[in-house]
Amino acid sequence: MNISKAEQRVLHVLAKGGYIAFTRDDAGRVTHVQCLTREGLGLADCSLAVFTKLKTKRLILSRQGRPYRVTIDGLKAVRAQLDNR
């Protein structure tokens, strides 16, 4: 599966325990997204376009109105990255 660099960065953060917080408008459409790490720091690469691509590919999922998290398919699709902690 072809995944862009921005999508890889977002999936990597989600795979490590992060989540995507979102806001909806009156019609129920997602209007704003923010990717947060498990420490609570924001990721600048997470845009509405990246969010839509990940959701269309079913790599992220929201259950019962909670923030979006990575799916099993998303974990399989993410490539390993070096963590400079």
Curated annotation (Swiss-Prot):
InterPro entries: YjhX_toxin (IPR018654). It comes from the Bacteria. Coiled coil: none annotated. It holds the Pfam family YjhX_toxin. Belongs to the UPF0386 family. HAMAP family: UPF0386. This is UPF0386 protein Spro_1532. It comes from Serratia proteamaculans (strain 568). The lineage of its organism: Bacteria, Pseudomonadati, Pseudomonadota, Gammaproteobacteria, Enterobacterales.
